[in-house]
Amino acid sequence: MNPSKSVTPPLWLLAELTYRCPLQCPYCSNPLDFSQQKKELTTEQWIEVFRQARAMGSVQLGFSGGEPLTRKDLPELIRAARDLGFYTNLITSGIGLTAKKLDAFADAGLDHIQISFQASDETLNAALAGSKKAFQQKLEMAKAVKAHGYPMVLNFVLHRHNIDQIDKIIDLCIELDADDVELATCQFYGWAQLNREGLLPTREQIANAEAVVADYRQRMGASGNLTNPAVRDAGLLRRAAETLHGRMGIDLPQRHADCTALPCHSARQLPVAFPSVLERTLDDIWYNSFGFNRYRGFDWMPEPCRSCDEKAKDFGGCRCQAFMLTGDADNTDPVCSKSPHHGKILEARREANCSDIKIQQLQFRNRSNSELIF
């Protein structure tokens, strides 16, 4: 465990306001047992969390979920965060968004909006989201967001069922005048891990997608188009654990809808007790709690991590992934080619290459499925 003085303050607070959501994406990062989570922080409790985070030095606040638009107090939360000096970002599916709400959010001081899509066409988007009306609503709201003058990021979670249309995805983003595009290769936690065999792209799909994005970047740069398509790492398909280091208490605290403070979306599954913000202050949690300090620094690392010349870059990789795939969070992340458990990744790749799971065979993120699992 590191002494408190060696730990830098958190820069970004991700507030998962709720697990309620009108969509049913089979790759959702929310916990499988979300149906068992009954509590949400009140308006006043959230504002107190914001105040504590700002006092610690946090400068950016993301409103997430579930779908944050299901919170009727969202304008009040935005205003409180803005008054505290946060740069605020709404991370939304766009379902439930209206021009009237955009006006209210602007009045409250919202700085930035990210809208997620499931695909570049209505049919595939409907199949993945579990809603036939979602695609047109997203299109309308993306246009409305730009009309209201917000900076806008469009987010697409990529997996085997939509990655081959990546050229059409980028074309749609250009058409909608997105300021940035996040092509986020599916991260296999939560519902995505449950559906991994049916979602994991093949290596050939990833290579083709990267080539398409590289070509677009070159052509768009030459034409002066400022839209920036950014590809988030391919997770199980390559060794790039350095992209995960911020998820283990370096600069990314997350506050979940049930009052628990977590260092990442998936840390709930670890055999570590994480504290509630109703019982301890954020400052105390960040600097002194066992859960947030358990995997800081290098002392906890086994070999080959401890003597690896890249440990200051990847921080031993993802503890949640190590736990999911090996049953022991202390093990070297199997994504690393040096890991004695790397065979599990090779096995997952082989399964992906042989898989013929259709979209309708996936387990969708909804309350009924959550209750069946738990």
UniProtKB/Swiss-Prot annotation:
Transmembrane segments: none annotated. The keyword Nucleotidyltransferase does not apply. Its EC number is 1.21.98.4. It comes from the Bacteria. Binds 1 [4Fe-4S] cluster. The cluster is coordinated with 3 cysteines and an exchangeable S-adenosyl-L-methionine. PROSITE patterns: MOAA_NIFB_PQQE (PS01305), RADICAL_SAM (PS51918). GO terms for molecular function: 4 iron, 4 sulfur cluster binding; cyclase activity; iron ion binding; oxidoreductase activity; S-adenosyl-L-methionine binding. Keywords: 4Fe-4S, Iron, Iron-sulfur, Metal-binding, Oxidoreductase, PQQ biosynthesis, S-adenosyl-L-methionine. It holds the Pfam family Fer4_12. It is an enzyme of class 1 (oxidoreductase). [4Fe-4S] cluster binds at C21, C25, C28. Pathway: Cofactor biosynthesis; pyrroloquinoline quinone biosynthesis. NCBIfam families: PQQ_syn_pqqE. Interacts with PqqD. The interaction is necessary for activity of PqqE. This is PqqA peptide cyclase. It comes from Kluyvera intermedia.
